[in-house]
Amino acid sequence: MSVEFIYPEFEVIRNESKCIACRVCERQCANEVHSYDEEHKIMKCDESKCVNCQRCVSLCPTRALKIVKSDCTLRENANWQNDTIKEIYKQANSGGVLLSSMGNPKPLPVYWDKILINASQVTNPSIDPLREPMETRVYLGKKPEKVQRNKDGTLNCELPPQLELSMPVMFSAMSYGSISYNAHKSLALAATELGILYNTGEGGLHEDFYCYGENTIVQVASGRFGVHEDYLNAGSAIEIKMGQGAKPGIGGHLPGAKIVGDVSRTRMIPEGSDAISPAPHHDIYSIEDLRQLVFSLKEATEYKKPIIVKVAAVHNIAAIASGIARSGADIIAIDGFRGGTGAAPTRIRDNVGIPIELALAAVDQRLRDEGIRNNVSLVVGGSIRSAADVVKAIALGADACYVATAALLAMGCHLCRTCQSGKCNWGIATQRPELVKRLNPEIGSERLINLMTAWKHEIKELMGGMGINSIEALRGNRLMLRGIGLNEKELEILGISYAGE
């Protein structure tokens, strides 16, 4: 029997003078951290199972609980840090690949925080969004190079299919199975109310959600789970998932424990079987192959829906995007290395890919240099945390942004990063019925609507301060940005000047 070397990461601090042994913590914890000692009439806890999801802390009626990070550490070593050593212990115990959830948590540069936004002062007037109109509406899809008119002044150009958004934000792909039915419904309800879109992810679309089709993007991934003619025609757009920011170069994996009931039927795979998406699409090994799938999907939907191609931000992303822009795709979605996931190998999540800020700037500039920027719209994701990040992304060249982790937080996620376990105490990343019901989709959607409404107000305020009254005028306007704490090469790639210049 092996010795367990790993000390619990978190400690449960219980104020015995406040605790009334109501056992709420015991009932609410899917990880079975808390238990009641009948003999001594007290609550006990197994701290080795605690993931710091804060469910017990939030629901304790007397505020008797708090979770703190353990101060029990190994001897300090700059090379062999505590996390590194504990990961080796885990692999020595299990012999398996380490799995993690959410995005890259390492203390690597966050370029959004090193970019500052301009404001109008004296020489050019700012705009008051409370008193003057501000246009946050955007259209995604292929645009003509120039506007042509008939002799009577009417437009003489036919636009390919476009996606209309009330603001430049969409809910990113999170599959049914990785998140719960109620979480998906929350996203669908919110997207419909807000006039934006949400993405089904690679798990198909539950039959109950077909009614939200006008605000839905359906995804086709390498596993082709849940893909059929009705599914393709159900949404307003189709996204081909070639890669994901949290795990570039590999496919998805949803454990069989989550393939139950409606998830099994929606994905069209046997109940209890692992849903393993191949690393590549086995019909795509070149840009020409991608072009064939793009036009196959257009044919299947009678050229009525824009086609999105989603890729992870990797080292040669500008060249990849150039090829995609020539493939017939209408929109390119790029996912940065901090993008979230329900489960990914830890080594890949923490070491593969590049920041979305650098990828976006490089792609936008490459497409402009090649004269094909209007061939596609650019949507970026991978840790878009606030309205300020959205504004900076658009100024760097994006047409719109994908958000996912921020949406999960709005629904109640506490970022404990154990989505892969299926034991989400907040009813989001789980398929256990007793946990799923903890998320009320009416409340979840209301909180999402509140978040996006707040962001929309903030986007208008930031634009107004710059003297800009439309997203179109902001897109690619890098003169509105300045860098701080960046070196010359970083500034060159981002295409911005240093603060003070």
Task: Show the residue positions of the predicted features.
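Flexible, glycine/charged-enriched surface loops at secondary-structure junctions
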Residues: 199-204, 303-310, 373, 466-475
